[in-house]
Amino acid sequence: MKSSKAFNAAVAAALVAAVALTACLMAFPQLLGGQSSAVAETYEEKVFGTGGVLSVEISVKESDWETMLANATAEEYIVCDVTVDGYTVSTAGIRCKGNSSLSSVFSSDSERYSFKVEFDHYDSSRSLYGLDKLALNDCYADATYMKEYLSYEMFRSLGIATPLCAFANIIVNGEPWGL
């Protein structure tokens, strides 16, 4: 009988310790090397929570830009500075992205590519409010520019995890590139 009570007490103590440890790790995820929710909220709010059209300005050496577009399927990063709604991340990496859409745009002799921006590609300390990558999709074969956005919003409203998204007006070296 005594051993049964001791066993129950040990199990109860272990459960209390496990709950306390779990609560601490949830409150302080950086203890395990995780990203705190404050960082996630920062880019969620500042980049994707504006409710409007983002302004994305890309500054890049013109010859590098032309080479990247001419060799889009190589998916090679080039150095650029990216400004999103007034916040600049210098020395970021940018490349054309996609698979079938990249091939289709390339073979159609169009330059309306999707881009992948890696803010930390050349310097791991760089980010956009904690965001290290940004996809700029061209909405290829979507004349409405709405399908992807509405799909993400629909899934999000159903409680399904989806990528954050927003419309963006892209400007490259001071020239409009498109929405």
Language model segments and positions:
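Phosphate-handling architecture centered on phosphoinositide signaling
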Residues: 2-179
